[in-house]
Design a protein with these regions (language model features):
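Conserved PLP phosphate-binding loop immediately N-terminal to the Schiff-base lysine helix
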Residues: 1-17
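Conserved PLP-binding catalytic core of the aspartate aminotransferase-like
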Residues: 113-143
Length: 184
């Protein structure tokens, strides 16, 4: 898990191990959350170095080496914020509503935007699409950068017949935010 950690309710009992690069939803860059069943920890190969065994950290209360104090502090602040928002169910509802707004635009664009995921398989966290032509995509990326939209236009999936470029967009703080948003 990464983009979707704490974005929706997940029954952790369904997994032996959850490894979440959680810097998008839970804390600063580099934060990793690991949730492991004790039965899974016991399956580590003996020849693994100590630092590569999850059991090393579990058996030492995650304090085998110096903990990243600031990252832990920020995760704690984020968890409190999520609780204040109404918990994970409220966060999931909010995420679904925001994603629906974007998917509705894609679905009702008469082919201007082309979504990739089947409706039942869509992510509320990573919305992928293309525009009708590669030229339109280049223009979209250029104009998006001016509006503080971070566009990963270089993501390419290899299909059996030909590569399929996928656009993924995320808002990021603008360097010139005052000038960009002064009319709002």
């Amino acid at each position: 898990m990464s983009s979707d950690i704490l974005s929706r309710k997940v029954n952790v009992k369904d997994f032996d191990l959850i490894y979440a690069g959680a810097q998008k939803n839970l804390g600063p860059a580099g934060v990793v959350i690991v949730i492991a069943k004790k039965s899974f920890l016991a399956t580590a190969r003996e020849e693994l170095p100590t630092m590569l065994k999850y059991s090393t950290f579990a058996n030492n209360d995650s304090l085998y080496n110096t903990p990243p104090v600031f990252a832990i502090y920020m995760v704690n602040k984020t968890l409190h914020w999520i609780k204040k928002q109404g918990g994970i169910n409220a966060i999931a509802k909010n995420n679904a509503a925001k994603a629906k707004l974007i998917y509705d635009v894609i679905d009702n664009s008469n082919g201007f935007y082309k979504g990739h995921a089947a409706p039942e398989a869509r992510s509320n966290m990573n919305i992928t699409f293309n525009l009708a032509t590669p030229e339109m995509e280049k223009d979209f990326v250029a104009k998006g950068k001016l509006q503080a939209l971070s566009v990963s236009a270089v993501i390419v999936l290899s299909a059996a017949a030909a590569p399929v470029p996928i656009m993924q967009c995320r808002w990021r703080p603008a360097r010139r935010w005052r000038s960009l948003w002064k009319n709002i």
